[in-house]
């Protein structure tokens, strides 16, 4: 089977997604299950069920995040520590985990290093940049602080985000109000 020759659209997608593709994307590119299995036995790596890295190297943070978004499905977005780290908050360290959120009716689940949480709270400031869909900076900071595991780390995340002008105190207050409206009559 040898080296793959990709059409222009697929080659662009491979570059855009840092060498990570989902099963449906490979099928759309014309690859059979047998061809995918052959490449997995020789050149590719399974990152998550149905998501493949098109080389055998150690996956980068970006590749793992893209894999998490592909595995979680349409409308998935980075959240919490992963999103805050993506926005550049160094105090937000997701470690080996990739945290994503999905809208209902999708379910909360954990697979390998992927943590998928369902959220009914809308985020009007969600951002899409290339293959990344990411919650707003304010939501990322509040989620990251909530799940940081330590009051000191939570404070560091908030302080760094404000000092870097990623968010304002008004942004954080507005996001808190959006969360609290969910429980109002």
Feature names for model-found ranges:
Residues 1-185:
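Short gly/ser-rich loop at a beta-strand->alpha-helix junction or flexible surface loop bordering the NTP-binding
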